[in-house]
Structures are given as C-alpha cells and as structure tokens.
Amino acid sequence: MQITDQEALLRCIEHREIFHDEMLTLFRRIMSGEMSPVMMAAIITGLRVKKESIGEITAAAEVMREFATKVPLTDTTNLLDIVGTGGDGANTFNISTASMFVAAAAGARIAKHGGRSVSSSSGSADALDALGANINLKPELVAESIAQTGIGFMFAPNHHAAMKHAAAVRKELGVRTIFNILGPLTNPAGAPNILMGVFHPDLVGIQVRVLQRLGAQHAIVVWGRDNMDEVSLGAATMVGELIDGKIREYEIHPEDFGLPMIASRNLRVANAAESKTRILEVLANTAGPARDIVTLNAGTALYAAGVASSISAGLQLAREAIASGAARAKMEQFVRVTQELGSKA
C-alpha cells in the first residue's frame, strides 16, 4: 500500500498507526535515499512522539534486514546474538562482550552485531579492538570466524550501508529515534536466538513481540530496574521471553541465583582501555562484581541459545567456563583467528 511522506507525518501528528505495508514503503524510501532529510527527520521524530507501535517497528526491521549485507551461514543451531540497545547511561564495561566469550566457551555459537560507542564509554567494537581482534572482516570471513571459533563479530557499518542515508539526520537530531531500537533486531547472520538488553522498561514487552513477529526462536529481552540494558546485579531485572512461539513476562533477581546485589556504579569504566582491563580480569577468574555480572549474563545467554535448560543451569556452565580458563582461551583464539583471517583478505 502506498503512502506519501506527508500522509505519514499527518498520521504521526494525529497519533494514528502507520500500517505494515505503508511502513515498508516509507522505510524503503529512507534506506534507498529517496526521502528528503527534512521529511525523514519529521517522520522519525513524529514516530517517537506518538510512540512507535509493534507493527511499525516490525515493518521497519524487515526493511533494514532486506537492505543488510548478510553473513552466509547455513547452520544456525545454538546461534545467538548478545546485544543491547545502548543508551542506558550506565557506562559499565562491555558486559555483553565478555559474556560472549564465556557463552562460546560453554557451547553457544555467537553472531554478535555491534558498533562503536555512541553514548557509552565503550561500544562492543571499541572493546574488541582494544583486545586486539580484527572487527572489520568481510561477511564471508565472519562466517569463517564462526566456523573456526564459534564467534563472529559483525561491525554494523559493514552490514548496513543503506543506513548512511539516515546518518546525518540522526546525528543532527541528537535524540533517540526508531533507529536506536532497530539495530538489535537486524542480525545479519540471521541468528534465531537473542539476549537483548533495552534502555526502557516499555521496550521489554515491545521488542519481544517484535521478535515474535520476525520469527525468532528463543528471545530474552531484559531491562534492569537500576536502568541497565543487561541482566542486573543492582536490582530486579524485567524479562520478556519468547520460546516455542509463546511470550512470558517475569522478573528475576540476583539473589535468585545466589549472587550478592551490587550497584552498577561499581562496574563503570571511562573508556575502552579500562573496559579491556575489566574483561581480562573476569576471564582470569578474578572474584568480584564484574565476574558475577558476566556469569549471570553469560548464563542467561546459554539458556537463550538452547545450550542450557534454564538460567541457573547456564550460570553453572558459565562459572565452569571461566574457572577452567576455557573462556580466556576462547577470547585468545578469537583474537588470533580474526587477525589471521583479516591478513588473508
């Protein structure tokens, strides 16, 4: 169904839904560079003001997937993305990046999709760069990295070239828009499982329902009540879980897993170098809140990937992967293999 840019803007102003086919049309115009910067800014701001619906987000994500440069993978068994929307303002070390190594060492296959920092002190790409990994592999080499190490990192700008049409508008607006929640929904390797952190409690229910419509297999969407886009140690965590096509919403608490509560300020870092130090401490099995929060998030990831039967079972696997040195070895292998693959390219 066709809709003009002006009609779409009017719908936003009147707080009315833009239907699925109409949203497909609009986002194809954005991603192909056909929409003017003025109309793009007006529409994405209007969507934010009226609050994007589940249907609108789903359609926009479908278009972004359509335009993405894919990673050629045929086997997606136990394949997982661990990703956050960012923007929680917590400035913690890269918990999901550390958790990725632990989960992979315990049997998950990871296709992590991320970028450099926008609002935080260190994005996943910044942390991996600091650890010495090559984050700029071509899609077929990302697939090879997954085959060899069980981990592939997809640097978002390499897979979403069409996003360049929105880049200047997003930068000048300087506020969150629908694009902030689309990135985690558009894994270029088609990972059917996901552990996703979000920056607002309303997004827990929204994103898990979008993932349901997009055909995800096992999705866990989390928001810590201390405003973290991770499973938190400082407060209860709201969870939206999609499994076997059904959605369940509940809360978990660190004490449910025998972990002490600790404020997120104890996990803060100023830059990627500090984040690297924290990650290496965790992988060296240094006791403390950093190890605890990585264990909790890696355990949840292992459950989401279908490797563990529950978060508690995943937690046990994560503990063993860290204590045995397997997680540290996995990180070292990933760094070495990505460097080797990059030098062949």
From Swiss-Prot:
Cofactor: Mg(2+)
Residues annotated to bind Mg(2+) 2: 229-230
Binding locations of anthranilate 2: 170
GO molecular function terms noted in the UniProt entry: anthranilate phosphoribosyltransferase activity; magnesium ion binding
Residues noted as binding 5-phospho-alpha-D-ribose 1-diphosphate in the record, renumbered to the chain: 84, 87-88, 92, 94-97, 112-120, 124
Residues reported to bind Mg(2+) 1: 96, 230
Enzyme superclass (EC): transferase
Details of cofactor binding: Binds 2 magnesium ions per monomer.
Sequence positions that bind anthranilate 1: 84
Function in brief: Catalyzes the transfer of the phosphoribosyl group of 5-phosphorylribose-1-pyrophosphate (PRPP) to anthranilate to yield N-(5'-phosphoribosyl)-anthranilate (PRA).
Subunit structure: Homodimer.
Protein name: Anthranilate phosphoribosyltransferase
Gene field: trpD
